């Protein structure tokens, strides 16, 4: 039986992933201050204990949530803050913030990059909100919101430079269906979470072009090698296991699952949609669109050869034909 935790926490964001995180916390009898900026969602939570727009079938125990549109009210008296909005909206979410976050544990569940800033969420919060690295954590791993919201078994990694911070977050989340481990590879798991979205776009493009499973296996193997080479060059540590869930597991589920929004975007591109029309077709943000530009810049800086990520960038930002770009890639994959 789950015991009630002493820490009070906040979740900033009201999409599918934020809703799944709130579900997990409330199942653990953890009270959550929840930043919800949408009036329809606020009303549905208060009246029916459901988020009417995202995971509308997911019941949220009303006794354990305090929804509010006031970010300062939401974070004021909490110990731990979860960031769970698309990366493109993070600065807008935090714009009204006057309360300091420096003495709180701030957990990024974003899996994205700040567009135009080219900083990871951890780097952004450290630089602009003065949250010390010891108070910053990343929560990542193979974790579709739809499955977490259904309480289906998932394995997540909480990474922080400070083991005590990681353990506190782990204790809040851990239960029978949400299993957490800890890591100190903060920048590595955060980079992997960003990169796998780009690679899911590549796989989606191949699916849209009607390449078969044999080729997809080779493509994803190439993605794993490319990611490993990039991590070793840009965030080198001695004990990283690229086959762990935070790296390989997240890559595989994002590339293979029909629930993956990045794969879905890639599939539209592979079927011949323009970038603009494919983005307009998406009902949720595909983080890989923003991440591709960042990975391109980083690979040029580190000198790592990344032909798969480069192919995605060419299609998204250089008006390359998805068919021609993928055909060129097939000639160098092994």
Feature locations, PLM:
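NAD(P)+-binding Rossmann beta1-loop-alpha1 motif at the extreme N-terminus of oxidoreductases
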Residues: 1-58, 64-69
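Rossmann-like NAD(P)(H) cofactor-binding subdomain of soluble oxidoreductases
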Residues: 62, 67-76, 80-153, 169-171
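Alpha-helix C-terminal capping/helix-to-coil transition sites in glycosyltransferase folds
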Residues: 76-77, 195, 248
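Internal alpha-helical scaffold of NAD(P)-dependent oxidoreductase catalytic cores
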Residues: 89, 100, 127-135, 153-240
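NAD(P)-dependent Rossmann-like dehydrogenase/reductase catalytic/cofactor-binding core
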Residues: 203-207, 232-334
């Amino acid at each position: 039986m789950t015991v009630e935790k002493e820490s009070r926490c906040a979740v900033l964001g009201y999409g599918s992933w934020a809703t799944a995180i709130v579900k997990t916390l409330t199942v653990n009898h953890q009270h959550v201050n929840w930043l919800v900026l949408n009036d329809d969602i606020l009303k549905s939570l208060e009246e029916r204990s459901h988020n009417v727009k995202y995971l509308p079938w997911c019941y949220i125990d009303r006794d354990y949530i305090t929804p509010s549109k006031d970010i300062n009210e939401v974070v004021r008296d909490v110990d731990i803050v979860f960031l769970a909005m698309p990366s493109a909206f993070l600065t807008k979410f935090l714009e009204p913030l006057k309360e300091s976050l420096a003495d709180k544990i701030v957990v990024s569940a974003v899996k994205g990059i700040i567009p135009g800033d080219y900083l990871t969420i951890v780097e952004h919060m450290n630089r602009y909100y003065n949250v010390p690295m010891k108070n910053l954590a990343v929560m990542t791993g193979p974790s579709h919101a739809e499955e977490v919201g259904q309480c289906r078994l998932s394995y997540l990694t909480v990474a922080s430079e400070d083991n005590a911070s990681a353990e506190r977050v782990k204790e809040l989340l851990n239960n029978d269906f949400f299993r957490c481990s800890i890591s100190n590879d903060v920048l590595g798991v955060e980079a992997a979470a960003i990169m796998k979205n780009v690679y899911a776009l590549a796989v989606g493009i191949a699916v849209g072009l009607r390449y078969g499973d044999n080729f997809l296996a080779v493509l994803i193997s190439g993605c794993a090698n490319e990611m490993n080479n990039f991590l070793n060059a840009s965030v080198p540590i001695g004990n990283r296991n690229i086959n762990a869930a935070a790296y390989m597991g997240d890559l595989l589920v994002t590339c293979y699952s029909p629930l993956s929004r990045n794969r879905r975007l890639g599939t539209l591109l592979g079927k011949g949609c323009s970038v603009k029309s494919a983005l307009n077709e998406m009902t949720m943000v595909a983080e890989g669109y923003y991440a591709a530009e960042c990975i391109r810049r980083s690979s040029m800086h580190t000198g790592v050869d990344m032909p798969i990520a480069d192919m995605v960038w060419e299609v998204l930002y250089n008006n390359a034909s998805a068919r021609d770009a993928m055909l060129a890639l097939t000639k160098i994959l092994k």
